[in-house]
């Protein structure tokens, strides 16, 4: 059964939440065999890396796959990350680029 977790609002608002919808749980159980967690600071670092090195502006949820790949780079398996979304508040982006606390 789905579990309810603590949720803290952040700029990574496109993913996450308190739980999976009950109707979706059977599908999730079939398709997902695990999950990885990163901090908001790790996602901010991924947003900054994408902006500075690749000139790509990704929203928090869009940069989360890169944050996970960087946090778990010790695995020997190839990784592909889908980076998406540019819906990031300009002030939040500026704070990320200045490496300020969010």
What are these regions, as identified by a protein language model?
Residues 1-102:
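PLP-dependent amino-acid enzyme catalytic core
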């Amino acid at each position: 059964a789905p579990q309810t977790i603590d949720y803290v609002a952040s700029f990574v608002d496109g993913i996450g939440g308190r739980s999976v919808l009950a109707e979706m749980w059977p599908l999730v159980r079939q398709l997902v065999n695990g999950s990885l967690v990163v901090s908001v600071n790790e996602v901010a670092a991924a947003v900054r890396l994408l902006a500075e090195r690749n000139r790509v502006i990704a929203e928090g949820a869009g940069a989360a796959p890169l944050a996970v790949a960087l946090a778990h780079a010790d695995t020997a398996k190839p990784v592909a990350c889908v980076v998406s979304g540019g819906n990031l508040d300009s002030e939040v982006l500026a704070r990320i680029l200045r490496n300020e606390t969010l």
